[in-house]
Amino acid sequence: MLLATSGRLDGFKVTKYLGIVTGEAIMGTNFIRDLLASISDIIGGRSGAYEQQLEEARNIVLNEMSERAKRLGANAVIGISLDYESVGQSMLMVVATGTAVYIEPEM
């Protein structure tokens, strides 16, 4: 399954547009991770714990979106958009949206 943020894939033509597909994940953070992130905020630097959680959530939503596209008969998803939101004080929501398509190599 090819995934792209652009609406076009070089060397391929879209032969079928199969619809909008999404993937969603809401991840809870935990007390220890919040504490470590607070320390990073105070002393400066990056929060590895939150970065790892963001990466995990992003992988979940892209895989979920790909599976939904496959069920529609797609072999690619184009125009992908990722959105990150905080929900409450300790939840992270990640949403991926794209267009499921069937592509073929250009001749």
From Swiss-Prot:
Coiled-coil ranges from the UniProt annotation: none
Recorded superkingdom: Bacteria
Gene3D superfamilies in alphabetical order: Hypothetical protein apc22750. Chain B
SUPFAM superfamilies: YbjQ-like
Family from the record: Belongs to the UPF0145 family.
Record protein name field: UPF0145 protein CHY_0465
Source species of the chain: Carboxydothermus hydrogenoformans (strain ATCC BAA-161 / DSM 6008 / Z-2901)
